[in-house]
Every structure is written in C-alpha cells, then in structure tokens.
UniProtKB/Swiss-Prot annotation:
L-tyrosine binds at residues 37, 175, 179. Catalyzes the attachment of tyrosine to tRNA(Tyr) in a two-step reaction: tyrosine is first activated by ATP to form Tyr-AMP and then transferred to the acceptor end of tRNA(Tyr). It comes from Serratia proteamaculans (strain 568). Its EC number is 6.1.1.1. Belongs to the class-I aminoacyl-tRNA synthetase family. TyrS type 1 subfamily. Its main location: cytoplasm. This is Tyrosine--tRNA ligase. A motif ('HIGH' region) lies at residues 42-51.
Length: 424
C-alpha cells in the first residue's frame, strides 16, 4: 500500500468514516513516514470484533511504511468513556483493569511488527503519564485548554446531558480531557501525528488535535473507521450468545470461523474489504466468479479462512476446519480431545452422564426427546446417530468404543440437533 495514496486506498475499501483536513494529511503522508496511534481501553478481558477494523487499520499503515503505536488505556480504563453510552459505566477495580491491560497488550501484539527497523511498532500505556500526575497539574496544564461550552455540545455526550434519569458524572465527563492529552503526550514522546479510531471516537480525537495544537503548536490529524453494520440492519459482531471475542477461551476458533461462514451474501464482499488484506481486484474477481458459478458462493469460506487464520493462527484455523468438516460429514475420527472441549465451550448442549446410562436415557437427559417412548421411536426410525454412526437398536447400551478419549460421545437427532455427552 503506497503511502502517497493510502487514504484513497482506504476510502476505496470503505474504511474511512471521517478525516480531518484530508488534503493536508495526504500531503503529509506523501512527504514520508509518520507515527500514528490507536487506543484500546481495557473494558473487558479481551478485545472483540468491533476492535478488529481499527487494529487492522494500524497494520495497513505499518505495511505502508508508517510507525504504529498501540496504546492501551491503563488510566482511561479506570475512568470510562461516556461516548454514545446511555448510562454510566460500572467502575472496575485497579487490579482488574491492570489484569485486562496485560491481556489486551498481548492480544494486540501479534497483529503488528515490533522488530522491523525504523517503523517498528510501539506498545504504550497511558497510565505511564497519568499515574503520577497530580490533580493541580491536570486542572492547570490540561483543563485550561478545554472549553466546557464546546465539551457539552459534543454529540457523544449530548444525549446523556439531556437525560433526567442518568446524566453524566464529572468522572466520565473528564474522559475527553484524558484522551485528548494522550494525543498531545504521544506527539511529545513519539512524534505521533495521526490518531485513528472508531467513528464513535470523533469527539475525543478532535479534542486531542486541538490540545496538541495548543500545547505544541503542531498540526496533527484524525481519521475514523466506520461502525460496521450489516445489510439487514442488525448489529455486526454479535451472536445469540453475545459478543464475538478475539480471545480463544471466550470465543473458540471453531465458533469464530462459523461466525464468518454465516456471513450473508449481501455483506461478504464488503467484509472482505474491511477484514482482510486481499487486493480489491482479487475481491472483485471472487464476487464475479461467485455470481457466475451457479453454486454456493466461495467468498464466505475465503473470509472465514483469512480472518480466523489471522486472529487464531494456522493451528486455530486447522482446528476450526477440522471440527466443521467432522460435524458436516459425521466422521469424528479426526477430531482431537481439544476439539470436543471447544464444542462444549461454544455452547453446544452438553450433559454429564454416569457410565450406566443407556441410549434412551441419554436422549431424554439431552432433551433431544421428551420421553423414553419417543426415544425408542426416534432410534427405530434411524433418526439418531452416535459419533456420526446411525444407531437403530432402541435398547442400545453404550460401549467403551463410544466414549472418545474415554470421555466424549456426540449424539445427534435428525440433521441439526446435537448434544455432547461428557461421561463421568
């Protein structure tokens, strides 16, 4: 991605929501590499899909020769960003936030290159400059540059100020000053000239630009990526079970892979532009091929492979594909013990059974049928499989061979109703 037309290329991918002084920024990028940053507040113990677009945007800039700074908000995470939030956030303890800071720093690291010469990435934590700052310094040196009149007119907090039931605390109201100072301080420490973030961060980003100009007499820039929406109007990055997380212990590689496989045709080519590094020509060719093939589109599989491989590595992708193929074909012999544990983690119905339970009892306990009588009927009509093999003996008792890894048995009724038995 050549620097001189990087903004144009990002726009072609639909990755620019707003940008300050686009012409001046394009000119600055054409002059040579810059340092830029994106902030990630530790509001949970993992990043989720909503963080992926700005994180990949940092990577896109690094690939074009620029220096990315990944800022984890050890201080701002203790305060809470009120931007477009309907109610006050619950304050987390310092211990919890510190623990989350470490986890998020580790999560961000694989996406960037920290050892590639002059544009090696930097990891920063804003607690480093706020942790020792006293309140007088904060109010005199930072607060004097902010107009309350302007702050209360920012869209991000306006709705909270107009609500009688919630309002906004001074704690959250001051968040804007903290994030604004981050930009100024990162300019001071690392000559950072550009901040990127989600479109909900526009108000905080412009505050940082104003403060850096006042404190350092320097023009700096801001760029936001769009809030990702789906064609059907529903929220992106959520499943029935909640958010899709980047941490494998919160959303397994298999479930993550399935999330992308289930992308609607109306969204998939747009998502390839947002979430992969494939060339636009390649994406357009794939769309054309899918349109003319007369078969199911290939794009969802390409998207699932690209993003799962990027987030979970080759091993995570291999496990996700192995589980997908095994469940589809019914042949479970290639699945590992860890694969079965992933299914249990993902919310596949799982029951614990004692060793003497028979098939009828297992089906009832698994809520695949309401009664033993119904179980007999289902088994007799060849509608039940054990580990992918049809079982038509209504009086069947499980054998050791049915307990894969001495522990797991996968039951299926019909084509789609699964339950994992975890033998005790």
């Amino acid at each position: 991605m050549a620097s001189s037309n990087l903004i144009k290329q990002l726009q072609e991918r639909g990755l620019v929501a707003q940008v300050t002084d686009e012409e001046a920024l394009a000119e600055r990028l054409a002059q040579g590499p810059i340092a830029l940053y994106c902030g990630f507040d530790p509001t949970a113990d993992s990043l989720h899909l909503g963080h992926l677009v700005p994180l990949l945007c940092l990577k896109r800039f690094q690939l074009a020769g620029h220096k990315p700074v990944a800022l984890v908000g050890g201080a701002t995470g203790l305060i809470g960003d009120p931007s477009f939030k309907a109610a006050e956030r619950k304050l987390n303890t310092t211990e919890t936030v510190n623990e989350w800071v470490d986890k998020i720093r580790k999560q961000v690291s694989p996406f960037l290159d920290f050892d590639c010469g002059s544009n090696s990435a930097i990891a920063a934590n804003n607690y480093d400059w706020f942790g020792g700052m006293n309140v007088l310094t904060f109010l005199r040196d930072i607060g004097k540059h902010f107009s309350v009149n302007q702050m209360i007119n920012k869209e991000a907090v306006k709705q909270r100020l107009n609500r009688d039931d919630s309002g906004i605390s001074f704690t959250e109201f001051s968040y804007n000053l903290l994030q604004g100072f981050d930009f100024s301080e990162l300019y001071n420490r690392h000559q950072v000239e550009l901040q990127i973030g989600g479109s909900d961060q526009w108000g905080n980003i412009t505050s940082g630009i104003d403060l850096t100009r006042r404190m350092h007499q320097q023009q700096v820039f801001g760029l936001t990526v769009p809030l990702i929406t789906k064609a059907d109007g529903t929220k992106f990055g959520k499943t029935e079970g909640g958010a899709v997380w980047l941490a494998p212990e919160k959303t397994s590689p298999y479930k993550f892979y399935q999330f992308w496989i289930n992308t609607a045709d109306a969204d998939v080519y747009r998502f390839l532009k947002f979430f992969t590094f494939m060339d636009l020509a390649e994406i357009n060719a794939l769309e054309e091929e899918d349109k003319n093939s007369g078969k199911a589109p290939r794009a969802q599989y390409v998207l699932a492979e690209e993003v799962t491989g990027m987030v979970h590595g080759a091993e995570g992708l291999a496990a996700a594909k192995r589980i997908t193929q095994s469940l589809f074909s019914g042949a479970l012999h290639e699945m590992t013990e860890a694969d079965f544990a992933q299914l249990a983690q993902d919310g596949m119905p799982t029951i614990k059974l004692d060793g003497d339970a028979d098939l009828q009892q297992a089906l009832v306990n698994a809520e695949l049928v309401p009664s033993r009588g119904q179980a007999r009927t289902m088994i007799g009509s060849n509608a039940v499989t054990i580990n992918g093999e049809k079982q038509s003996n209504a009086e069947y008792n499980f054998s050791d061979a049915d307990r894969l890894f001495g522990r797991y048995t996968l039951l299926r009724r019909g084509k789609k109703h699964y339950c994992l038995v975890d033998w005790q």
